[in-house]
Amino acid sequence: MLSELSTHDKIVGIKQLKKALAAGQTAKVFLALDADPKLTGPIAETCCGSGVPVEEVPTMAELGRACGIEVGAAAAALLR
């Protein structure tokens, strides 16, 4: 549920998300469906392998708004 992004600690962006996944700090990942699959695909695979739930969001703009930023976001995550 996107509203979780406004009430929990989060990270926004592919680079930060990759680091947090590697460190085991993510509780849930959000991926924009209109983002480049070359960027989001490896993240989805990592989440699947590590048991981190993934929620798909229709657009980068919608994900960016949910994160409280004025630009689109390809990926975001809730932190543990």
Language-model regions, residue ranges each:
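Short aromatic/hydrophobic contact patches that present stacked aromatics
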Residues: 28-30, 75
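Ribosome large-subunit tunnel/peptidyl-transferase-proximal elements
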Residues: 1-25, 36
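Short, flexible micro-motifs
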Residues: 16, 27, 67, 71
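C-terminal structural segments of small proteins and small subunits
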Residues: 7, 50-80
